[in-house]
Each structure stands twice: as C-alpha cells, then as structure tokens.
Amino acid sequence: MFSSTAQELEESDHFNVNLDFETRTSILLSKMTLKEKISQLGNNAPAIPRLGVLEYNWWNECLHGVARAGTATVFPQAIGMAATFNPNLINDVAVVISDEARAKHHEALKNNDYSQYKGLTFWSPNINIFRDPRWGRGHETYGEDPYLTGQIGTQFVKGLQGNDPKYLKLVATAKHFAVHSGPESERHFFNANVNQRDLWETYLPAFKDLVIDANVYSVMGAYNRVNGESASASNYLLQEILRDKWGFNGYVVSDCGAINDIHANHKIVKTPEESAALGIITGCDLNCGGIYQRYLQESVTLGLISEKEIDTAVYRLFLARMKLGMFDPAEIVSYAQIPFDINNSQKHDELSLKTALSSMTLLKNNGVLPIDINKINKIAVVGPNADNINALLGNYHGTPSSPVTFINGLNDYVGKRAEITYSIGVDLVKDGADGLNLLSDSIIKDVKRADLAVFVGGLDATWEGEEMPGGINIDGFYNGDRTRIEMPEIQQNAIKAMIDTGTPVVLVLMAGSSIALNGLEKELEAILMAWYPGQRGGNAIASVLFGDYNPGGKLPVTFYSSTSELPDFKDYNMSSGNGFTYRYYKGKTLYPFGHGLSYTKFKYSKLKVNKIRLTEKEKFKISFTIKNIGNYNGDEVVQVYIKDLNSEFQMPIKQLRSFERISLNKKDEKIIEFEFIPIKDLRYYNSTKQKYMVEKGSFEIQVGSSSEDIRLKKIIYVD
C-alpha cells in the first residue's frame, strides 16, 4: 500500500473485498489511463501509485521446483516425473512447489522485492509432445504420448493452482501452445506445417486436458509459426480453439521475444506497431518483452487497434492478480500464511527422494542387480556423471541446499562394507578442447580388480536444452538440439574398454532423452535410466542398485536404435518416414515406450470386457487380474492400449488410453478395472467434418507392461 494515499485507496472499490473479483477489476480498469493500461502489458509491469497498484514481474518458473529464486527443493526433471507414471505423486510434488513458491513470494514482499522470479505467475508446465529425441528441450516435457502428458500435466497444474474456492494459489501456464518441438536454432523463424489430424490427435489433446480438466489459468504461445501464423498471434489457435471451442477464460502470454519475431523474423507484418496490434487482437494478452509497452500507443494512433481491444487484455491480467489475492489483505488469503521455513524442508526433501525413486527406469538386467552387498568387496565407478551436479538438475531448476551425486549416494550407502574406487574417466563429450578422452591404465586396473563396475554417463543440460545462440556447434550437437542420438563416442569407447576387462559392467544413464547405444546394450549386464533425478538423485540410484528400492519407472519416450531410423527433424507429420513416437514408428525399437523392468515378475490374467458390441456413446468396462509372482515386493504400471484393426485410412499403430501404477507385495494379486467410451477413447479427427468421430468396426484392447509387451487382448466392435 502506498502511504500517501492509504485512506483513499482503502476506500477505493477495487480494494473492496465485499465485491466480486470481476466487478473490482472492471472498476480498476475504468480508473486507468490508456498509458497506464499499456504499461501493464509487459512481463515487467510498473507500479501505478495513484491506484495502489504495485509493480509486478510476471516471469517465474517452476518446472520441477521453484527455479532461479535461490534455495529450493529440486525434484526430478519433468521427463523423470513422467517416468513415474504416477499423476497423484506429481500432484503431491506440485503442492510442495506451490507451497515454496507462496512462501518465497510473501517473504520477498516483506523486503519490498518485486523483481523477476518473485511473483506468483509461473511459466510451467511444458506440455509439448516430445516428438523427436533430437529436440533439446524434450526433457522439460512429459514425454511423447498425448494421453500421458495430459494426465501428468493435469495433476501438476491442480497442485500448483490449489483448491481454494476463492483464491488461486499460483497461476500455472501451459506451454508452448501448440505445435512446438524444435529445431531450437530456428525457433524464431520456423514454420511448423501440420495437418489437421496430427494437430487434433497429437499436438492439442494435452492442452485441451489442462484447459478443461485442470482449469489452467494461463497459456503461453510458442515462438514458431504454425501453418503460417505466429503461434503467439494466431486467431485460429488463441481465439477459435482456445477460447471459443474450449472455453478458456484465463490469459495468454507470449514466449519471450515472440511478438518481436512477428515482424523481425516471421515477416508476417512489417513494423513493431503492427506486431503489437496483431498480438492483442488475436488474443495474446501479455508480452514477455517490450513490444506492447513501447509501441501500442502508436498502434492506437495509427488506427491499428482500439483502446477497447487493449482493455480486454488488461482486464484479464488484473483479474488474475485479483484472484491471486494481490489486492486483498494478506490475513484473509489463506495461502499468504504459508511460513517461509517450509522452503526446502526435510519433508520436501523426502518427497524429492520418493519421486526420484519412482522415476528410476530399469532398461536391462541380466541378474546382476540388485547388488548383494555381502558378496561384493570392490566396486569401480567411472564416468562423467558420477559426481556431476548438473546431471541431477536438468534445466529451469532451483538451488538445492545439499545435492547428492551418485558417488555421494553410493558412499553413503556402502560405507565401509566395500571398497569403492572412482574416476571421472572421460568427459561427457569430446568438444575439441583439452580434456579426458581415454581411460587411463590405472582406471582399467581398478576395473579389472573390481567385482563390479558402474559407468555413469549420458548427458546434461549443457548439451541438451534451450536454444544456445552462438553456443554449441560440435559433432552431435547444435545450439541446444542433438544432431545424433547415439551416446557420445568417447563414452562408448570407455564402456567398451571396461567391458573388455571381463568385469561385469552396469550402465547408469543420466539424461533427459533417449540414447542409442550402438550395440553396447548387448554386452552390458544392466542398464538403469536415472533421468535428471533431482537433489536426492544419488541416494535414489544407490537404493535401486542395491535393492532397497525395487524400480518401477517406465519410459515416457521411445528409445530408438539409431539416428538413421528417424524421419526429418523438421517434419511435423507424425507418420512421415518410419514415423515419430511409438504411435507411428514402424521400425525396431531399442527399448519401447512404456518399458521398464522390475526385480520381481507380474502375471496378467482374466481379461474381461463387459460389452463386446456397442455404439460410440456407450461406456464399456474392462477388468483383469495382476499378480506378483516374483520374490520381491514391487510396483507395476499396468497399461491399456487400443488399436484400430480395420481403419480405412492411416491410424496410429496403437494408443495409450489408460494406466495405473500399483504396488503389490510378493504373491499378492489385484483386480484392475478401467472404463472407456468410444467417442473419447477410440476416436479420430475427421478433417473434412472438423470434429472427432469413431469409425465403425473392430478394435483391439491390449493390456500389458509396455507398448510392446502386451500380455492380454480382447476385440470389441463398434456398430
């Protein structure tokens, strides 16, 4: 509150808590000049002292923990959260993130700190489809499947935004709407050409889920064009689909600099005044950048836009701030009471560990795992990610107070029960600089003498991530993206040298995307995909290797055998070439979508369908029994896919339509039930009629442990 006008402001109706937010927002808007309105349309919005409006920075991030705002609990990267196949767990994660975000925000207010990364509007989650493993930002997403992405994303948003009937806890932002997955180096001028079926069946469903099921309050437009229109200024995407079809009632923000791209790079218009007007008119309310604030006044003068059109955007933004409680006394906003000391608390740290454990995905095991500590005297650890904090964190991360790398976690677990030798061995990538490119003789000797060797490699966000202009351009990597999916050669050579010693070798991969192993998978005894596992990653990996935790994670992406199997990176047609993702890929996978082993075994049986013939609007139920027939307690992710058996046109090979992560003690069994409805679960998008439809004919219900490990099948018929 501004003291010089405190009494007047207290009497102002836009501070009157007895009025609804919509009325208060309209009152505030009516008092603002055009200049003041325009000033609020950038991510860095200045104060309006005469109206009691505090300055506000809209830019904040919380992809897997509160990011870039000091110490915070760091959870596994988004792709690792997807590997849990556990939406309820991810809701718990998001609740913790939003608790820490609220606590940080109110602590900042006490110190009159209104700077970037201190607000309550967060530009997370990233729900783009991880179409191609070469895309550098894929690890920010929930993987390649629209259904899984929608389920995980929905619970993440619900956890962030809270369940108070009046106030928003935070504003979550679904990004990047709507067809966006590389190349990073071309994102400011690239045009993603996409057909209507791929748009509605692959790229839009997760956004629709978050808008309709999670009531996400903000959507971010992408940098690139989609079929010729800027995604951040597309009437088709932002008005016809988002608001008219889906009923979205929040606000839209551009990606940072995307409004400038409209004239500067996409060449859709010629001037910044035109870009500013086009952005507002098509439904982009907030510009991350300064184009609106610098040029909208002139846009009005030139007759490109009216003040009334600007009012719509300003109203949406202030309504969001009202709903966050920014114009109400803190004592009546429940979320404002969250204490600062919950930040990075022990309870939150334990949830980070639990999530990391749940994300661990066992790709191969010849029986060497779990390690029996009583039968091992010496372990040789080699690899560039064994003590690499960056490999815990991914990108868009906070600062963990006590990060645990793999070698730290291993030492904590083993203690004095076995001897551990460790060497980085080689760098992640041979980048032309002086570095570690070959294993030394002393390392080879350590491996030979060991009972078991562990190579910890993969990538980190230095090599795969957001656009790196003027940055990385070496063999296999280009400005954030990968140009090849094979493991860097110096790591391959190191693993080969270790295998040649005759000592059993376990590979721990820390990465955010699929990695081809050039045949090494045949010679390795075990492979564990650990993703970027967050602040307790080292403890989680050690617990899995020694059997204290039985892994149950599943791949949210396909692992391909080689780059040569992939279609053109710039082709957004899902069925091009060999096809993108498990839904269209016709080649042989290295490890399929949904794959993940356990130390125990599960038996599926007794699949029943309550209706074999039905109409498109009739619900049907399936049930089956799953039993843990192994020697360990464990988790299994049961997966249900549906395959169209007699389509007259190209359909996905199969599509995930439900899943559940269950825990079963050894010898226990459980009956699992799912319900479906054809018009939702068996549909396709008819481009001619511009609506979802169901083909009449036969469909196969597939139940299994992965997209390729199908244990039970039944055929149903839609009349």
Name each model feature, range by range:
Residues 2, 6-684, 693-708:
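Glycoside hydrolase catalytic-domain context in secreted enzymes
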Residues 690:
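Extracellular/periplasmic metallocenter environments
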Residues 709-719:
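Short beta-strand elements
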